[in-house]
Amino acid sequence: MVPVVALVGRPNVGKSTLFNRLTRTRDALVADFPGLTRDRKYGRAEVEGREFICIDTGGIDGTEDGVETRMAEQSLLAIEEADVVLFMVDARAGLMPADEAIAKHLRSREKPTFLVANKTDGLDPDQAVVDFYSLGLGEIYPIAASHGRGVLSLLEHVLLPWMDDVAPQEEVDEDAEYWAQFEAEQNGEEAPEDDFDPQSLPIKLAIVGRPNVGKSTLTNRILGEERVVVYDMPGTTRDSIYIPMERDEREYVLIDTAGVRKRGKITDAVEKFSVIKTLQAIEDANVVLLVIDAREGISDQDLSLLGFILNSGRSLVIVVNKWDGLSQEVKEQVKETLDFRLGFIDFARVHFISALHGSGVGNLFESVREAYDSSTRRVSTAMLTRIMTMAVEDHQPPLVRGRRVKLKYAHAGGYNPPIVVIHGNQVKDLPDSYKRYLMNYFRKSLEVMGTSIRIQFKEGENPYANKRNTLTPTQMRKRKRLMKHIKKSK
């Protein structure tokens, strides 16, 4: 399960600044959803190759009376969803009554909480945080979120201990892997393969979308039942339900983010739709079905959720629900809108269905299998290098400082999503347009469908870069005599 970190504190203590720095963006990856407090943001972040979800809660009112209400409305929900809470205070403003009230609430929870003193730039950190020890939350971590000072230390001391279950990417000797495969292929031998067989594993399938777009109806239709489930896994409200199923002799695990879902029992919009459940289901899935309401069209929330799916690198199938009952004219308008707003993801299949009546639902699984097979397909180093060579022959890389960028070889760097690692000289100077050209060339050459391809570039380091020449004693004596001769000639 992907860890969840909540940022809590008074207004203007720097929560959004820290959120943007952690998620490396200037806004939330997933925008506000109907039924949820508007000023809560959700984003995807990473530290040392380990992923986590960050929640930016709105500022809590500055009065003790207001704290109780606002905590119940939004911040308390974020705390319950989180694995770790970062309680932020303003070192410049000093200790405030609202800080004490918030700390009182946090101490009553058994949630790991860490006190972060922001805006310590230009101050003596030890002196600036001394008053906050009275909050009784242990060690204080001074940072300057706007400049990034102390943020890395905060991540290492707070987040990494809670991420043992999310292992970083394995480091391999990529050059050795390349030459081993190349030599084996030149000798007519089969390249060594690992024991991983993606076809032997069930496909984890997540159905996500905004409230009331028909996710539960589609889930019921797939399972052939009148209800999704009448029980939930024990734990917090962010637990999702994993439902094993089989279709056409292929095993699946359906990830249900709806929680307890007896029809007519749930009326609270927040209870119906949990952003955290959705984000964690996306991270855990192999293939994501993004459900869109044909009658409402694509909203900004749909695009924000789509952005999170793409950033997570998951395979994607777009499902346009409630297609029945629309006139032909309206259907054409919907298709034109889809082409216009989703033109940047031409690799994803789009299905028009009616989950209520079942039309088109059976065709979804063909696209799901296609997307899964594309994302887990093993491609040899020799083939990737040949494709790279053909791409270079069709369109040469640009000149950088008068020299042509040289691409040497390519190999697989990961799967789900497929990652192609290209080694060469001056590859860091390649323009984005040429990188997109290479990505599209690989996708078309490999006939990848339902998943994006990521291209990573690695450049050989110059061992003499930023190093002064070291002279032998004989060379030093010659240099000394030469310098004396130059001075005399002047």
UniProtKB/Swiss-Prot annotation:
InterPro entries: G_ENGA, GTP-bd, GTPase_Der, KH_dom-like, KH_dom-like_a/b, P-loop_NTPase, Small_GTP-bd. CDD domains: EngA1 (cd01894), EngA2 (cd01895). Pfam families: KH_dom-like, MMR_HSR1. GO terms for molecular function: GTP binding; ribosome binding. GTP 2 binds at residues 209-216, 256-260, 321-324. Keywords: GTP-binding, Nucleotide-binding, Repeat, Ribosome biogenesis. Residues 3-166, 203-376 form the EngA-type G domain. GO terms for biological process: ribosome biogenesis. GTP 1 binds at residues 9-16, 56-60, 118-121. Associates with the 50S ribosomal subunit. GTPase that plays an essential role in the late steps of ribosome biogenesis. NCBIfam families: GTPase_EngA, small_GTP. HAMAP family: GTPase_Der (MF_00195). Belongs to the TRAFAC class TrmE-Era-EngA-EngB-Septin-like GTPase superfamily. EngA (Der) GTPase family. This is GTPase Der. It comes from Salmonella paratyphi B (strain ATCC BAA-1250 / SPB7). The lineage of its organism: Bacteria, Pseudomonadati, Pseudomonadota, Gammaproteobacteria, Enterobacterales.
